[in-house]
């Protein structure tokens, strides 16, 4: 199972590194303009807006791009602790993405990719959690005698 978990981790890491790079570096003019327009919408419904903070759309896009790029790279080549931290950060990011798309009342087909990524990241996190706790929970070596009734 650890091989499959490793493959999932690498695939997710490469995916997020590429999507982060696409947000940071101008791929093509139409794609960059479309992404800028999307982040203008995303900034309008930013979850912290209720507390008076609304990010600049370009800064928002840049921050998300760097987070995806760095967390994706750390998922692939980072030490285990940084892989787990990166996974948690990406889970939070994908939760925010799903929230944003739901608030914008986008069609289901728009937020399915973010929901699938969120599910895969949660699966990866669960596998890491189970691997950590597997050694911590051990069966007792002595048999426990059955309780006798009074």
From Swiss-Prot:
One of its GO terms (cellular component) is membrane. It holds the Pfam family DoxX_2. It is found in: Membrane. It comes from the Eukaryota. Residues 1-21 form the signal peptide. Keywords: Membrane, Signal, Transmembrane, Transmembrane helix. The chain crosses the membrane at residues 62-82, 84-104, 111-131. It is a multi-pass membrane protein. Belongs to the DoxX family. PANTHER family: SPINAL CORD EXPRESSION PROTEIN 4, TRANSMEMBRANE PROTEIN 35B. This is Transmembrane protein 35B. It comes from Mus musculus. The gene is Tmem35b.
